[in-house]
Structure formats: structure tokens, C-alpha cells
A protein has these predicted regions:
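Amphipathic alpha-helical repeat scaffolds
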Residues: 274, 305-313
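Nucleotide donor/acceptor-binding cores
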Residues: 89-92, 192, 301
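Conserved S-adenosyl-L-methionine
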Residues: 174-295
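Accessory substrate-recognition/RNA-binding modules or partner subunits associated with SAM-dependent
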Residues: 2-140, 144-149, 155-161, 168-169, ...
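A short acidic, Gly/Pro-enriched loop at the edge of an enzyme's catalytic core
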Residues: 292-304
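Glycine-rich nucleotide cofactor-binding entry segment
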Residues: 154-157, 170-180
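Composition- and surface-driven signal marking solvent-exposed, interaction-prone regions
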Residues: 271-274, 283-289, 300, 316-327, ...
Length: 385
């Protein structure tokens, strides 16, 4: 049975995801705002779960219909063939987002969908499934925008940035899916040396090592679709074959040196724990030191980092805020000087503060706007002369 899928991603990373899904040879890939769609069998969605590095979720579309009011939303949802997917023994939860809709409360919209699903299953099966908001077998996703409802099933279960590899984190860690997008959009070559001078908990270095060794991002975790009744049998055998093929692609070592550096003890502890959990101790070298003191370790390579944005946490425009601004400017000046010492290298930086770009004083060959959660940031790439 051919169905529609929609892979969500961080705003601004749609191009990276589209190229990724096309490289996976998924049928009829089409870009959209906030994600990328494709069509195919359930196995195609499973392949996206296993291999897509930049996708946040993989949604299987069950239906799309006009929903100008709550009654239309209920009836349209109830008309879908839920009994083809769920049984009375499976659990469910509904998540909703509403945009420019007559129904303005997402929780109420989710409740109407839940009512429609359980009423349909009670009618068709004689029993109703239970709701489990914390750990459901089926995650149902409603997107209600401008009077049109799209109802989907979430194949992943937990979001795809949860690779099953991170055990420790630092303040405001970068999500793995966004880190993968930074590497893809920045054109980071796994065959060249890689250094993250402000590695934090190591997300960029770990994602780079996974790419370099061709380790599929979904190999170490479970997915929601594995709990679906339709998974047992054909899809389960196909999934086992997919994972076996993915393991056969793994390289024994990364082809070039990978260095993750940080100054702070808590970050270094998280870095060591996460690299060990990922099984990448032989691939990633951990260094302790100030990023501003880094010197080139080879004639060329990639400096890739996500420096602190220096968001102003203090209210107002008082002396404390101005002092903070001066400290941030001084810090970025030191980072810029470090980058400029790396002649022959390529710097790829995810920056949330224009002070860094001003300090470097080179025109970036890439300046790509994207979003880190609610924050607008820029992916900057410089070739250091």
C-alpha cells in the first residue's frame, strides 16, 4: 500500500533533508516548509527512520480533509480507517498544532481527534483502546492549518534526535539532527581533519564521526513503528534486513583525525561519557584547553563549532548588560583570531551572534539562516586564506 510520508526538520534545514532523502532513493521526494515529503510503502518510512540524520520525525499521513470547525474535525477523523492500524489493545496519544484555525486551542483539537479515534474503534472492534500520554504504541499527530486538517502517525516514537547515544549533556546542548544539518549544509568533508574547539557535550564531533564511519543514526535505538501490529511479519523481516545492510556499510575507523576540545570540566566529563557511549573512543580525540589558544594541527581541515551565543539574560540596558556585551565582544575577538590562524582550513560556525562575523572580518562564502529551536541563527562558512 502506497502512503504519503512527511519528515519534519528544523526550519532552514529543508534542503539538507531533501538531498538526504533523495540519496536514500525514496520515491517522489518533495520539499516543503518545515520538512520534506515522499511517498512509498511502510518500508520506505522505516528506511528514513534508520538513515535520515537531519529529520526530526517521520510522519505517515492517514488523511487530509477540510476542518473548518470542531464537528468537521471530528467527522473527518472518524471517517479514517483506524482499524487498519490500531487494535483495542494498543495505546495511543494525540498531539496537535493549530495555525490560523477556527479552533485555537491545540489541546481541544487533540481531544476531538482522540474522541473520534476511540469512537471509530469502538464501533468497528467492539472495544476502545486506552490513552497513554507518556508511552503510547501509536503517536497520532494532527496539524490543523487554515481550515485543513492533516492526521498522521509518528513512525519514530521518540524524536529522531534521540539517537540512544547521549548520556550526559551541557547547558543548551545542540540537537543531533541540527548538528547533522550543520555538517551537511557546511559541506564538511569526512576525509579531512575535523576539530571542534568548543565541543561541549560533543554533539558535532559525534555526528561527524558517525557520518565519517557511515554509521546509520538509527542503529542504536527503538522506534514507535516496532510496536504496531502491522509491523509483525513482513515489515519486521524487512527491518532486520535493513539493519543488517546498514551494519555492513560501517567503516572500521574514521578516515581522518577528529578532535573535540573544551575548557570546562563539566563539558569534558559529558564529552567523555557520550563518546564512550557511542563507541567512538578510537575515532575522537578529546583535548582540554581554551578554544582561543588552539593552533593548527595540520595544513588543512575543518574547524566546526557552535560557540556560545551570549544571549542577554539580564533585563534592561543597564551597566551589567553593557559589561556582558563587552565580555562577549572580547570572547568573539579571541575566537576570530584563532580562526584566522588556521590558514588553509575551512571554518563552519553556527552563530547566534553577529559579533563573531564582524570580528572575523572575512566575507563568508556561506551565510545560511536557520533556527535552533526558537532562536534564529546563521550557519557561516569561511575559507581561511
Amino acid at each position: 500500500m502506497t502512503v504519503r510520508f512527511f519528515d519534519t526538520c528544523a526550519k532552514g534545514t529543508e534542503g539538507a533533508l531533501r538531498r538526504e532523502l533523495a540519496a536514500l532513493k525514496l520515491p517522489r521526494v518533495r520539499g516543503d516548509r518545515g520538512g520534506v515529503g515522499f511517498e512509498g510503502e511502510l518500508a520506505h518510512g522505516m528506511r528514513a527512520c534508520l538513515h535520515a540524520r537531519t529529520a526530526m520525525r517521520v510522519l505517515l499521513e492517514l488523511g487530509r480533509f477540510p476542518a473548518p470547525d470542531q464537528d468537521a474535525l471530528y467527522e473527518g477523523t472518524r471517517a479514517l480507517a483506524w482499524e487498519d492500524w490500531l487494535t483495542a489493545r494498543t495505546t495511543l496519544a494525540v498531539e496537535a498544532s493549530v495555525v490560523s484555525s477556527a479552533i485555537t486551542h491545540s489541546g481541544y483539537a487533540a481531544l476531538k481527534v482522540k474522541d473520534a479515534v476511540v469512537d471509530r474503534l469502538r464501533e468497528k472492534l467492539g472495544e476502545r483502546p486506552d490513552v497513554d500520554p507518556k508511552d503510547p504504541d501509536f503517536g497520532i499527530v494532527l496539524h490543523l492549518a487554515r481550515g485543513e486538517a492533516t492526521v498522521s502517525l509518528d513512525l519514530a516514537g521518540e524524536p529522531l534526535h534521540r539517537r540512544g547515544l547521549r548520556t550526559a549533556s551541557t547547558i543548551a546542548p545542540l540537537k543531533e539532527t541540527l548538528a547533522a544539518a550543520v555538517l551537511a549544509l557546511g559541506g564538511v568533508d569526512p576525509a579531512l581533519p575535523f576539530v571542534d574547539p568548543m565541543a561541549g557535550s560533543g554533539t558535532l564531533a559525534i555526528e561527524h564521526a558517525l557520518r565519517a564511519r557511515r554509521i546509520a543514526p538509527g542503529l542504536s535505538r527503538a522506534f514507535g513503528f516496532q510496536r504496531w501490529p502491522v509491523y509483525r511479519g513482513g515489515p519486521q523481516s524487512e527491518w532486520d534486513r535493513m539493519k543488517e545492510a546498514a551494519r555492513a556499510e560501517i567503516l572500521p575507523r574514521a578516515p581522518a583525525p577528529i578532535v573535540a576540545r573544551d575548557l570546562h570540566p563539566k563539558a569534558l566529563a559529558a564529552l567523555r561519557a557520550n563518546i564512550a557511549r557511542a563507541g567512538l573512543e578510537a575515532d575522537v580525540t578529546i583535548e582540554e584547553g581554551d578554544a582561543r589558544e588552539l593552533v593548527p594541527s595540520s595544513p588543512g581541515g575543518f574547524l566546526v563549532t557552535n560557540p556560545p551565543y551570549g544571549e542577554r539574560l539580564l533585563a534592561g540596558e543597564g551597566a551589567a548588560a553593557r559589561t556582558q556585551d563587552r565580555k562577549i565582544a572580547g570572547f568573539y575577538k579571541g575566537i576570530a583570531e584563532m580562526l584566522l590562524r588556521h590558514s588553509g582550513w575551512t571554518a563552519v560556525v553556527l552563530s547566534g551572534n553577529p559579533a563573531l562575523s564582524r570580528a572575523v572580518r572575512l566575507r563568508p562564502e556561506i551565510d545560511h539562516r536557520l533556527w535552533n529551536g526558537p532562536l534564529e541563527v546563521h550557519l557561516l562558512r569561511w575559507r581561511i586564506p
